[in-house]
């Protein structure tokens, strides 16, 4: 039970704290208003039933002492003897509590890592089935206090599943694949650095949401991690995590016996290979006795694996499992295995089929300490996918779900997208195995098929940025992941409200505003990126960030839309298509097989239809595209004003940081909207019924302006420029000027400039009206925003700056002067003159 309901009403306005950089995350423990009564009602002593400084119970005592002082100014002493319940917090394991406190009935039975929390006046008992559970209970108690909740409670809670891990895709050189929060906190220049202070801070955050394992390196692993010096470094990392109840694991490169061990083979049946892995594993456990185990990506996207030697994936997984077995370790074996060279010319080819095709025949052949780690959908972390059918096809195999906190396809932390509502569409989905209730959450816990292991993994990818993920608001997803991994039936809105109170305080307006924005953010992003199950429509061949729908097709990666001038969507039916729908149990298969019973939000995932196909909503497919993209972009515009309403209620540093990203998102959502709508308007030849697509009366196209030092440039992909054309300076040493006489009636407008901010240069622009400077800016988004930059004029680099409340007279002369820098030729797309209340 997590409780965030305060005893007293949330204040309507609370004084702003000093500037904060986000490093403390939701553990900032800001002072809670208190008239002194709550302090007097709190315990004065903390009794930790273990005095060993490396123990989680000892750490729990330190966390309680520090938290009480920060939240309420309460100075509580800590001791490790006795069991007085008079004005004391007693924290320890069930075993220690029963022995020291001489009680056998008060603490209930708990599952592994579960805890019991009892608050009765000044007497608080926090009792864990393990030391880890006791630490979790301490964080729970502090979370209540930090949210102004001084309720008396008594309850026990245990985890949904034993495996609650995070994955980091950190590389040995310090870079992070799909990381948007700065360089690695674990690696630099091929080694583990001496300063691991950020690792300790990360450990606190993870433990506070009950994460119990971490894989610290990229699944596309570098064998050099297994060198003795780096094993020593891993041991130092493990030493930092251990007091917080988090076990360290590593990703392995399957070919390491060859690339690092100088063997002629990495065949999992070869005795020398088996011995090599056994020796490596023994060396690791000699340094890290509680190592969690291994994560393996094999035979996928160019990674080596057992099929090279005609061995099965189970053969490969079991080789590692047997090396780990004596030490109690686990193999997390990724189900992300597919051929990325298949031909779209074959109507029946389908990447979505791959996981079941590879793994279903192996059900029951994996050792009992192997867990198959399955992405939530059949493709790759898309904005909406059906639940992977593999969850329903492994009766005799341990499974875990793989989620992604890092927003690889979902805005890369430069767009606000609160992910739990997306995750819940998968976790709650009932696969109806054998016509029995089979929600995904019950399969991964091991409950549905009576499996001993199972659980959760999330790709997180924090970095050295003080916001951890590159955005303050993105931290809600990491917090929520931990909460759901413990109890997946929790409500997404309740979770984000707890996070808001812990992160931004108890102000009611802040709570209500951020709750609404968060809950609207995923539907908005889905609307302006890709809808009806068509996938995210991002550029899958480059950054995975901005729009490029054509990149989905015509290649072997298998994220196809099969869009042509008449029709769109993948036919995944058994009757006419790839037979993917038949991978589901009968009841679900029947629903997806028939267009009449397929939900609109997955229509194009399962069916290839004409653009004029009517949806259940009554709209045609193409009109739904047009409307959804306008709706989503319009919602994103409102995020800015809603956040601005909180200006006096949030510290200036975090306020400005978030505001810059929301302003950017508002502009980039229009780039998305126009790119997707223009692409499909051009492809289908079908006009928007509401006459919005391609009609922009408030714009002044840059190529139509009077140019001096600027020249027109045909942008590719074409749809990422208004009217398909931008302007660039004639050379990288030439200043460009674009001028136009404005023919809008006199009034006050918002003046927007759409431009391209490319990697490799920091151009400078100045905007004039009749030689009066309206504003100026530099193209430095690579220093400000978190997303992967682009060296091209495209949907990744396209962005907008807006100058508000500009007084414009009809006939005024608009002039934009661009000064190129580096490889960036001060590119411009258009200017837009917007009356108040108009979304271009």
Swiss-Prot record:
An annotated Gene Ontology molecular function: alpha-glucuronidase activity
Main location: secreted
Keywords: Carbohydrate metabolism, Glycoprotein, Glycosidase, Hydrolase, Polysaccharide degradation, Secreted, Signal, Xylan degradation
EC number(s) from the headed UniProt entry: 3.2.1.139
InterPro entries: A-glucoronidase_C_sf (IPR037054), Glyco_hydro_67_aGlcAse (IPR011395), Glyco_hydro_67_aGlcAse_N (IPR005154), Glyco_hydro_67_C (IPR011099), Glyco_hydro_67_cat (IPR011100), Glycoside_hydrolase_SF (IPR017853), Hex-like_dom2 (IPR029018)
Reactions catalysed, as given in the entry: an alpha-D-glucuronoside + H2O = D-glucuronate + an alcohol
Entries under CDD domains matching the protein: CBM6-CBM35-CBM36_like (cd02795)
Superkingdom of the organism of origin: Eukaryota
GO cellular component: extracellular region
Alphabetical GO biological process terms: xylan catabolic process
Subcellular location: Secreted
Family classification: Belongs to the glycosyl hydrolase 67 family.
Protein name (Swiss-Prot/TrEMBL): Probable alpha-glucuronidase A
Organism: Neosartorya fischeri (strain ATCC 1020 / DSM 3700 / CBS 544.65 / FGSC A1164 / JCM 1740 / NRRL 181 / WB 181)
């Amino acid at each position: 039970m997590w409780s965030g309901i305060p005893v007293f009403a949330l204040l309507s306005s609370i004084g702003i704290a000093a500037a904060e950089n986000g490093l403390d995350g939701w553990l900032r423990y800001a002072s809670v208003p208190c008239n002194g009564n709550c302090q007097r009602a709190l315990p004065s002593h903390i009794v930790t039933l273990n005095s060993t400084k490396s123990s989680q119970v000892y750490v729990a005592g330190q966390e309680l002492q520090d938290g009480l002082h920060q939240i309420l100014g309460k100075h509580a002493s800590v001791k490790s003897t006795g069991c007085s319940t008079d004005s004391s917090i007693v924290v320890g394991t069930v075993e220690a509590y029963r022995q020291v406190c001489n009680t056998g009935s008060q603490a209930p039975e708990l599952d592994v890592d579960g805890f019991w929390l009892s608050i009765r006046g000044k007497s608080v008992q926090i009792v864990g089935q393990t030391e880890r559970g006791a630490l979790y209970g301490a964080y729970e108690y502090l979370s209540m206090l930090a949210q102004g909740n001084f309720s008396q409670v008594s309850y026990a809670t245990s985890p949904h599943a034993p495996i609650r891990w995070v994955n980091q895709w950190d590389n040995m050189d310090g870079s992070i694949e799909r990381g948007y929060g700065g360089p690695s906190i674990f690696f630099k220049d091929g080694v583990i650095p001496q300063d691991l202070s950020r690792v300790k801070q990360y450990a606190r955050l993870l433990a506070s949401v009950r994460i119990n394992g971490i894989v610290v390196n990229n699944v596309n692993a570098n064998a050099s991690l297994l060198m003795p010096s780096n094993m020593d470094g891993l041991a130092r990392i493990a030493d930092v995590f251990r007091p917080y109840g988090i076990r360290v694991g590593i990703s392995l490169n399957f070919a390491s016996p060859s690339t690092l061990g100088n063997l002629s083979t990495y065949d999992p049946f070869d005795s020398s290979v088996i011995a090599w892995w056994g020796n490596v594993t023994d060396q690791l456990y000699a340094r890290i006795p509680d190592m969690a185990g291994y994560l393996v990506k094999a035979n996928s996207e160019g990674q080596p694996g057992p099929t090279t030697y005609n061995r099965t994936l189970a053969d490969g997984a079991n080789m590692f499992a047997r090396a780990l077995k004596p030490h109690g370790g686990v193999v997390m074996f990724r189900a992300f295995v597919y051929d990325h060279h298949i031909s779209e010319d074959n109507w029946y080819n389908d990447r979505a089929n791959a996981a079941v095709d590879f793994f279903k025949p192996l059900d029951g052949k994996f050792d009992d300490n192997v867990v198959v780690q399955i992405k939530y959908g059949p493709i790759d972390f898309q904005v909406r996918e059906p639940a992977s059918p593999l969850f329903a096809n492994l009766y005799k195999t341990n499974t875990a779900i793989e989620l992604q906190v890092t927003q690889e396809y979902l805005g890369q932390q430069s767009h606000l997208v609160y992910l739990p509502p997306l995750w819940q569409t998968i976790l709650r989905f009932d696969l109806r195995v054998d016509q029995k209730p089979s929600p995904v959450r019950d399969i991964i816990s091991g409950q549905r098929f009576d499996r001993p292991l199972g659980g959760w993994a999330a790709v997180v990818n924090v970095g050295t940025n003080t916001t951890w993920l590159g955005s303050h608001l993105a931290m809600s997803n990491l917090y929520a992941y931990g909460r759901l991994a413990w109890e997946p039936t929790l409500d997404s809105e309740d979770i984000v409200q707890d996070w808001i109170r812990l992160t931004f305080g108890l102000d009611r307006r802040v709570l209500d505003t951020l709750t609404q924005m968060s809950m609207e953010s995923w539907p908005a992003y889905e609307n302006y990126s890709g809808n009806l199950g068509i996938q995210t429509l991002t550029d899958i061949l480059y950054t995975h960030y901005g729009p490029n729908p054509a990149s989905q097709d015509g290649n072997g990666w298998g994220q196809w839309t099969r869009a042509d001038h008449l029709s769109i969507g993948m036919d995944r039916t058994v009757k006419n298509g790839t037979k993917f729908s038949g991978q589901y149990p009968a009841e679900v298969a029947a629903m997806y097989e028939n267009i009449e019973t397929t939900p609109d939000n997955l229509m194009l995932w399962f069916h290839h239809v004409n653009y004029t196909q009517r949806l259940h909503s009554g709209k045609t497919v193409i009109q739904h595209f047009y409307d959804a993209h306008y709706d989503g972009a319009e919602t994103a515009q409102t995020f800015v004003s809603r956040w601005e309403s909180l200006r006096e209620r949030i510290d200036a540093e975090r306020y400005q940081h978030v505001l810059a990203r929301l302003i950017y998102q508002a502009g980039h959502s229009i780039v998305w909207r126009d790119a997707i709508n223009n692409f499909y308007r051009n492809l289908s030849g079908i006009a928007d019924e509401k006459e919005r697509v391609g009609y922009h009366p408030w714009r002044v196209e840059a190529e139509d302006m009077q140019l001096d030092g600027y020249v027109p440039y045909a942008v590719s992909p074409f749809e990422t420029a208004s009217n398909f054309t931008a302007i660039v300076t004639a050379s990288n040493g030439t200043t460009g000027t674009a001028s136009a006489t404005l023919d809008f009636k006199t009034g006050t407008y918002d003046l927007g400039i759409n431009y391209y901010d490319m990697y490799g240069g920091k151009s400078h622009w100045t905007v004039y009206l009749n030689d009066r400077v309206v504003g100026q800016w530099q193209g430095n988004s690579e220093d400000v925003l978190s997303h992967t930059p682009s060296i091209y004029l495209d949907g990744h680099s396209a962005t907008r700056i807006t100058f508000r409340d500009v007084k414009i007279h009809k006939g005024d002369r608009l002039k934009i002067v661009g000064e190129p820098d580096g490889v960036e030729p001060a590119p411009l797309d258009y200017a837009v003159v917007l009356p108040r209340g108009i979304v271009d």
